[in-house]
């Protein structure tokens, strides 16, 4: 039996079902390249020391270590930060396990998408879509965040932007994301990511972080660290505006 378990964005977010799955497992694996994970919770609940899997373990080797545990007739857990099904690597592991005749249960967790909108007091009904801000590869910038935000703003919808993970496993800080977005504006020049564009940063949620709000130009100078997400809000409703101002630090 394979359990794909999300334990939320930080300490204290794991559900009772997630803890029970970890307690019942013979092998507990976790990955921390899609988000920082509360390893201490895993250690307290697991029968044996949790085993860290790298991106290479899951993607290049197709989760071989997890599949070996299953082949021995054991219960295996792959624990992730947030909600487990936001990463395609986890879907590939599910398919591989089922193809070998192993039953699979997905244990949902609190996703960064829901948590970020809740923390910032924004209406989930106005979420227009999600894109990832990436560092340029070979000098080439992905225009997906620009195109999505442009379409969403025209429709009165908020845009949630996930941030890149570096090759060394560290997370893109919000200031780098703001620089990338403004560099896209220099190329596209359609007024989407100007230095004056309002932005909401939800950073280190569950790890002592919080919510900050300010124009992209100010975010580019802010020294907060990742992991974080950026939200490019459309026009805020009265309740959204009042609540965001109450919970956010202005920069």
From Swiss-Prot:
It comes from Pyrobaculum calidifontis (strain DSM 21063 / JCM 11548 / VA1). The gene is dphB. Belongs to the diphthine synthase family. This is Diphthine synthase. The keyword Ubl conjugation does not apply. It catalyses: 2-[(3S)-amino-3-carboxypropyl]-L-histidyl-[translation elongation factor 2] + 3 S-adenosyl-L-methionine = diphthine-[translation elongation factor 2] + 3 S-adenosyl-L-homocysteine + 3 H(+). S-adenosyl-L-methionine-dependent methyltransferase that catalyzes the trimethylation of the amino group of the modified target histidine residue in translation elongation factor 2 (EF-2), to form an intermediate called diphthine. The three successive methylation reactions represent the second step of diphthamide biosynthesis. Keywords: Methyltransferase, S-adenosyl-L-methionine, Transferase. GO terms for molecular function: diphthine synthase activity. InterPro entries: 4pyrrol_Mease, 4pyrrol_Methylase_sf, 4pyrrole_Mease_sub1, 4pyrrole_Mease_sub2, Dphthn_synthase. GO terms for biological process: methylation; protein histidyl modification to diphthamide. SUPFAM superfamilies: Tetrapyrrole methylase (SSF53790).
